[in-house]
């Protein structure tokens, strides 16, 4: 087994920092472009089956344009500027007393004084979400509660994060495997 020189060790650390900072910058760029604090979320429950399964990775967009009512926006405008939330859209929202975001479909929509108010429901649930809301909230407010609108998904890719959360030993096995891989890779060079 060959010992790494100081320069080789430093180069490895800098390469690792470059990869991590690039991933972080990519995520932050995606956050900026989609106007979402968290543009990627994982479905954690079965409440949206059959539309989404537990472990699906969802991609969100939170751009809320105001189109001229007389003009129907083109497909291009909807892609570039986003589109308003409508009945049937799947949104991700958070409530003040719940740290984990909820993924549900919009079933009722109210417009008042230039604000959009929503009522949501999981596809696999029998009743809407009003019962989950704190007493001070009667509906979801687009500006204060909605984190984003689902624009795409990747099936089951989020199961990795669920497994790492449910079984913490997997984190240590994965980190140990990565460390071992690094040692083996250096031995071969």
UniProtKB/Swiss-Prot annotation:
Annotated region described as C-terminal short (CTS) helix, given as residue ranges: 173-184
Membrane-crossing residue ranges in chain numbering: 9-25
Residues exposed to the Cytoplasmic side: 1-8
Membrane topology: Single-pass type II membrane protein
Segments on the Lumenal side according to the record's topology features: 26-189
Alphabetized UniProt keyword annotations: Endoplasmic reticulum, Glycoprotein, Hydrolase, Membrane, Protease, Signal-anchor, Transmembrane, Transmembrane helix
Annotated active site: 47 (charge relay system), 104 (charge relay system), 129 (charge relay system)
Major localisation: endoplasmic reticulum
Enzyme type, top EC level: hydrolase
InterPro entries according to UniProt: LexA/Signal_pep-like_sf (IPR036286), Peptidase_S26 (IPR019533), Peptidase_S26B (IPR001733)
An annotated GO BP: signal peptide processing
One cellular component (GO) term of this entry: signal peptidase complex
Disulphide bridges, residue numbers: none
GO molecular function per UniProt: peptidase activity; serine-type endopeptidase activity
UniProt catalytic activity: Cleavage of hydrophobic, N-terminal signal or leader sequences from secreted and periplasmic proteins
Family assignment from sequence similarity: Belongs to the peptidase S26B family.
PANTHER family for the chain: SIGNAL PEPTIDASE COMPLEX CATALYTIC SUBUNIT SEC11 (PTHR10806:SF6)
Function, in words: Catalytic component of the signal peptidase complex (SPC) which catalyzes the cleavage of N-terminal signal sequences from nascent proteins as they are translocated into the lumen of the endoplasmic reticulum. Specifically cleaves N-terminal signal peptides that contain a hydrophobic alpha-helix (h-region) shorter than 18-20 amino acids.
NCBIfam families for the chain: sigpep_I_arch
Quaternary data: Component of the signal peptidase complex (SPC) composed of a catalytic subunit sec11 and three accessory subunits spc1, spc2 and spc3. The complex induces a local thinning of the ER membrane which is used to measure the length of the signal peptide (SP) h-region of protein substrates. This ensures the selectivity of the complex towards h-regions shorter than 18-20 amino acids. SPC associates with the translocon complex.
Protein's recorded name: Signal peptidase complex catalytic subunit sec11
């Amino acid at each position: 087994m060959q010992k790494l020189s100081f320069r080789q060790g430093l180069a490895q650390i800098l390469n690792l920092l470059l990869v991590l900072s690039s991933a972080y910058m990519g995520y932050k760029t995606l956050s900026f472009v989609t106007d979402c604090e968290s543009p990627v979320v994982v479905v954690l429950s079965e409440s949206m089956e059959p539309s989404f399964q537990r472990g699906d990775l969802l991609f969100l967009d939170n751009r809320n344009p105001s189109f001229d009512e007389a003009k129907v926006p083109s497909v291009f405008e909807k892609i570039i500027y986003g589109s308003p939330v409508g009945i049937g859209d799947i949104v991700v929202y958070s409530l003040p007393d719940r740290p984990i975001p909820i993924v549900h479909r919009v079933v009722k929509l109210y417009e008042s004084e230039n604000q959009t108010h929503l009522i949501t429901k999981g596809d696999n649930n029998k009743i809407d979400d009003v019962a989950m809301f704190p007493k001070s909230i009667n509906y979801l407010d687009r500006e204060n509660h909605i984190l984003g609108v689902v624009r795409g998904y990747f099936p089951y890719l989020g199961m990795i994060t669920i497994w790492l959360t449910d079984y913490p030993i997997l984190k240590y096995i994965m980190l140990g495997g990565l460390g071992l891989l690094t040692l083996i890779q250096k031995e071969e060079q």
